[in-house]
UniProtKB/Swiss-Prot annotation:
The gene is calcoco2. It is a peripheral membrane protein. It comes from Xenopus tropicalis. This is Calcium-binding and coiled-coil domain-containing protein 2. A motif (LIR-like) lies at residues 201-204. Xenophagy-specific receptor required for autophagy-mediated intracellular bacteria degradation. Acts as an effector protein of galectin-sensed membrane damage that restricts the proliferation of infecting pathogens upon entry into the cytosol by targeting galectin-associated bacteria for autophagy. Initially orchestrates bacteria targeting to autophagosomes and subsequently ensures pathogen degradation by regulating pathogen-containing autophagosome maturation. May play a role in ruffle formation and actin cytoskeleton organization and seems to negatively regulate constitutive secretion. Residues 132-368 form a coiled coil. A zinc finger (UBZ1-type) spans 441-464.
Length: 470
């Protein structure tokens, strides 16, 4: 017996498969401590495998995992009847339980079941010496209960026996039908053999005629070979054109994707330029406010200087009047302090104005850089559009040269000129941070109208699209 576990299944077996292996010469009981030989026969529709096995199962088992012991069903018996031997060491102990042989295939499915048997000593015959048994009332009651259980088991076994007998009758009938079918098939085989001989003769005659036709059609064969070679060459050309066409399609898709990325970047830079223009406008407003405050302070400073001059003139005229001079000096000191405070405020405002001017210069320079980047991207988009148009022409030419493979035409979405143009570009030698702020000029390709607001320009283009669809 092999040391590893046999193939089993957790599923409950189907009883319709139990008749594929038939057990024979099964005793009603076997003596414990002695090897048991199990005999079985395969039916004509069953094909055994090397991993098939025979096991001893306790009656009322549910799955093939509940075996008590097992041996491999692979044996070298030449006859129809096979046999395997269960060693006494692995057999169940003596008891009143019933067991049965089961044949299990390599998938863990039951293919044959034997009648039940017991492992117990044989009961002595009536002619043997009688033995006087003295039992108590409890033992007698237990024996009666045990006898009742045995009678129930015997009744169940009788029922199983009737079922098995019916199955055997059905199997015998099936075997008889199969024998008749075999005889019919043998007769058909003889008839087929005769027809096969006739067909062989016809085949020989046809082969002779075929040889004659081959001799006659030698030149045609050469033409067919030449045509096949030409067809193969054309197919190779078509395959190479298809590969080239697929490559061009992939390049076209890559360019299309790159163009979409550039459009997204262009839109992003346009939004940034618009935001920076708004920041520049805010800084201009702040600068105008600061200049207004600066002008007001200058006017106030001029008034104070005029008053200071008047006070000095009054001091020169009223040097003789001590009290007036003292009062005037006190007023002059107060006004001097006020003037120093206002001069400090003016210096602070001048520093703030310088900072704002530097920020405006930086933003103007950044805006000019953004405009240059957008112009470069527009030029790149025009170049990509021309390249896509060139690829489309190549695809159209290849599609027209291959009639069985219709090519795809990819329309260039960037054939028209760029809709956005930037006016007032910085002239050579002009600093990016000039005093004037340049505005983005957008021109409509349909009617030639110019716009400074990007949203108004988009709405105008959308109106043209609606008119064209109507």
């Amino acid at each position: 017996m092999a040391s590893d576990a046999p193939p089993t299944s957790m599923l409950q077996p189907e009883e319709r498969n139990y008749s594929q292996v038939v057990f024979s010469r099964v005793e009603q009981s076997y003596v414990p401590g002695i090897d048991i030989i199990c005999y079985f026969t395969y039916t004509s529709g069953f094909h055994p495998a090397k991993k098939d096995w025979v096991g001893i199962f306790k009656v009322s088992w549910k799955t093939t995992r509940e075996y008590y012991t097992w041996v491999s069903a692979d044996c070298e018996e030449q006859g129809l009847e096979k046999r395997v031997t269960f060693k006494a060491y692995y057999l169940p102990k003596e008891s009143d339980d019933y067991y049965q042989f089961c044949y299990v295939d390599q998938k863990g499915e039951v293919r044959g079941v034997s009648i039940p048997f017991q492992l117990c000593r044989k009961i002595q015959d009536e002619g043997e010496e009688d033995i006087l048994l003295v039992t108590t009332e409890e033992e007698a009651q237990g024996m009666k209960e045990k006898q009742r259980v045995l009678e129930e088991k015997v009744a169940a076994l009788e029922k199983d026996k009737c079922t098995l007998q019916d199955e055997c009758t059905q199997l015998a009938l099936e075997q008889k039908n199969k024998a008749a079918l075999i005889e019919s098939l043998q007769a058909q085989q003889l008839e087929c053999a005769k027809k096969n001989e006739e067909l062989d003769q016809q085949n020989q005659e046809l082969e002779r005629q075929l040889e004659e036709e081959k001799c006659k059609n030698g030149s045609l064969h050469l033409k067919v070979v030449s045509a096949e070679e030409e067809r193969e060459r054309v197919q190779n050309d078509i395959r190479s054109l298809q590969l080239e066409q697929n490559q061009l399609k992939e390049e076209n898709m890559e360019l299309h994707k790159h163009t979409n990325d550039m459009e997204f970047s262009l839109k992003k830079y346009s939004e940034e330029a618009k935001n920076q223009e708004e920041e520049v406008q805010e800084l201009k407003d702040k600068l105008w406010d600061a200049e207004a405050k600066h002008h007001l302070l200058q006017v106030q400073l001029q008034d104070i200087q005029m008053e200071k001059k008047k006070d000095k003139y009054s001091i020169e005229l009223l040097t003789k009047e001590a009290e007036k001079v003292a009062d005037l000096r006190q007023n002059l000191e107060k006004k001097d302090k006020t003037m120093e405070t206002m001069e400090k405020q003016l210096a602070q405002l001048q520093r703030e104005n310088a900072t704002v001017l530097r920020q405006m210069e930086d933003l103007s320079y950044t805006l000019e850089l953004r405009k240059a980047e957008i112009s470069d991207m527009q030029q790149q988009r025009v170049r990509d559009g021309a390249e896509i148009e060139h690829l489309n022409r190549l695809l159209t030419e290849q599609s027209s040269s291959t009639p069985r493979n219709q090519g795809l035409f990819f329309q260039n979405p960037y054939e028209s000129e760029s809709l956005i143009s930037f006016a007032n570009e910085p002239q050579p030698g002009e600093a990016p941070g000039g005093s004037s702020v340049r505005h983005v000029q957008m021109q409509c390709p349909e009617c030639g109208s110019e716009f400074e607001n990007f949203q108004v320009f988009q709405d105008h283009i959308f109106c043209h699209d609606l008119e064209s669809t109507e």
